[in-house]
A protein has these predicted regions:
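Beta-strand acidic-aromatic groove motif in beta-rich domains, primarily in extracellular
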Residues: 306-331
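Extracellular carbohydrate recognition and processing domains
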Residues: 332-395
């Protein structure tokens, strides 16, 4: 009898719960049959109709029989449905955050039976980002490649002093544009349906110019070797620095050949105390206080007839404590004891090895040239962390570390193929890159 009473109590409790559910939640979600229809789409937080939305934006579908929706896709990306936000006439949903593999500009709605209804709606990618330009010192009329992310056409690109140029084709990571006549130095602007982006880099950037090999007061050779500074029919503008020669071989180990492959700028005159009148500190030309957010940039031309196949381009920075152009152990006008001219800071023989970046683009394919055209090379100063053999350098970099620059194609901890590279360099500069 007690057991029967207990069972009746449980049954009554269940009936009461069911009744409460029916009474208290009359709009509780129930999957329906048939196909949905959408009348329009609006923002979730305001009654404004829209035909497109950004990724991860919350929107509201308005229509009929929306409770029949079992699966929902924007293009080919599935949306996460929450039945708490679905009624017969409205459905609140967040646009998927991933880029579609195929952009169809449609919403796909499947019911439980797998039947399909569609609605035209465009998902916008995130706002564009511009990160690079294949040749920052290109002339008007030349075609360059702009790189970045979310660079989806249709878009426009604007150079200072010119009207925007329409771009109709882009895969999202890069596009090509012909620089318009009248383009002035400065940052470029890219506009897509998702927003506007301005480059950190500048077209024809002359900020922080260390060497242009043309005009004073920018210095040139100031070390043990006077490398070739010349011009020819390939010149970007005026003179350039040349390392290597068709008749000079760089062996497979990138063996030491400073006579042909080392450019040195070591500041300091032969005075006591050492002055910098004729050979200034490179910190006179660029502010390195934010060096972690800066990069060394230059234009590079390597002809296809003389590709580069061995050795690393060692981009070496050093303060006056490691190298200067004057005498050793002599005070300078700022009270520093100068190191004098030497190559020990390069090899680490008898002195701390100076920090450097190792530019080795040939290692990915075994050979590198620039396709008989100039390109811009960007090497962040945060990558100046190596020794000559590719091991990690422990020298503490400070803003005053950047008073000199040595470019030496040598070693780098890689083995390649003997070659006769011709390496042309112009417009070496220290600029912000992020």
């Amino acid at each position: 009898m007690k057991a029967m009473t207990r069972n009746i109590s449980i049954l009554l409790s269940l009936l009461l719960v069911a009744a409460c559910t029916t009474w208290d939640y009359p709009d509780r979600f129930k999957q329906t049959e048939g196909l949905p229809t959408i009348d329009y789409v609006r923002y979730a937080d305001r009654d404004v109709a829209i035909t497109q939305a950004a990724m991860e934006e919350v929107i509201c579908l308005v229509g009929e029989n929306l409770t029949s929706i079992h699966d929902l896709y924007f293009n080919d990306q599935a949306a996460v449905l929450n039945t708490s936000f679905i009624t017969e006439h409205t459905l609140v949903v967040s646009v998927p955050k991933n880029l579609p593999l195929e952009q169809t500009d449609k919403i796909y709605m499947y019911n439980k039976a797998g039947d399909l209804a569609t609605y035209d709606f465009k998902v916008l990618p995130p706002a564009p980002k511009v990160t690079g330009m294949s040749l920052e010192w290109a002339q008007p009329g030349e075609t360059v490649t702009i790189t970045g992310s979310y660079l989806f056409a249709p878009l426009t690109v604007e150079f200072p002093g010119c009207d925007p140029v329409a771009i109709s084709s882009s895969d999202g990571s890069f596009f090509e544009v012909t620089i318009p006549e009248g383009a002035q130095p400065g940052k470029i602007k890219v506009t897509t349906e998702s927003g506007v982006a301005q480059s950190v880099f500048m077209y024809k950037d002359s900020r922080g110019m260390l060497f242009n090999f043309d005009t004073d007061p920018h210095p040139a050779n100031h070390g043990w070797h006077a490398q070739v500074i010349e011009t020819d029919e390939t010149a970007l503008s005026g003179n350039f620095l040349r390392l290597g020669d068709p008749g000079v071989t760089l062996d497979e180990e990138g063996g030491w050949n400073d006579a042909n492959f080392s450019f040195e700028y070591w500041p300091g005159d032969w005075d006591e105390p050492v002055t910098y009148t004729d050979s200034p500190l490179l910190t006179s030309y660029a502010d390195f206080s934010e060096w972690k957010n800066m990069a060394l940039k230059f234009e590079l031309f390597i002809p296809s007839s003389n590709p580069w196949k061995s050795g690393a381009m060692q981009l070496i920075v050093a303060g006056v404590d490691l190298v200067t152009g004057g005498g050793a152990d002599v005070p300078d006008i700022y009270g520093n004891i100068t190191a004098g001219a030497n190559n020990m800071f390069i090899s680490g023989s008898g002195k701390p090895m100076a920090p450097r970046a190792l530019f080795r683009p040939w290692t990915s394919t075994g050979s590198y040239d620039t396709g008989d055209k100039w390109v811009t090379v960007t090497v962040p100063y945060s990558e100046f962390i190596y020794n000559s053999d590719g091991t990690v350098n422990t020298y503490e970099i400070k803003p005053e570390t950047f008073t000199s620059l040595t470019i030496f194609v040598w070693s780098g901890g890689v083995t390649g193929t003997a070659c006769n590279p011709v390496i042309k360099i112009d417009n070496i500069r220290a600029v912000p890159y992020k």
